[in-house]
Amino acid sequence: ASEGNDGQIEKAQDRLEVLKKIEEFEREGKFDVDVEEDPPTIVLTPENIDYLREKMSSKIKRIFANEMGERFLDNLLKNNKLIIKQVNGIENLNKVKTGALITCNHFNPFDCFTVEKVFRMSENEKDKRLYKVIREGNYTNFPGLYGFFFRNCDTLPLSSNKRTMVNFMKAVDTI
C-alpha cells in the first residue's frame, strides 16, 4: 500500500482481490475458508515440532526468540512502523483467569504484533503466556528472521498431517 496525492492509502491489487473475496465468502457464509492464495507448503510431521517445548534446545530457542521478538516489536513502535492509536476493552482481558481465544484477522502482517503488544499491556502478562496458532506454511516455509519467530515465539502450528494434529490437540489441552 502507498499513499496517494490526496492522502488516501492506495491498496495493492492483490489486497483488493482478497478484500473482494472476503466479501463474497461472507455473503456465502464461508467463514472457515482461507481467502488468501497461499503457496504450497511443506507438511509438518510430528518429529519436526515440539509443541510443549520439552527439549532443552526448544526451550532456549523460545526464550531467545521471544526476547528478540519483544525488541523487534518495541523498535516497530518506537520508529512509528506500527502505530496503536487506542486500546478498547483491556479490562476484559485483565479479567481472564484461565484461558482465552483471541482472534486476529491477520489481513495485515502487523495485526499479530498489535495483539501481542496489547497482551503485554494487560495484567495477565506477568503470569500467562500468549500462544499463537499459525498456519502450517508459516511454520515450515518461512526462512530468515520471520521464520525463526514463526517457529519459536510461542507458536502452535496447525498441520495437514493427522498425527501432528493429535499432538497439537494434546498440547492445547496441556497448556
What are these language model-derived features?
Residues 1-100, 108, 173-174:
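Membrane-interfacial terminal anchoring regions of lipid-handling membrane enzymes
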Residues 80-175:
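Soluble catalytic domains of membrane acyltransferases
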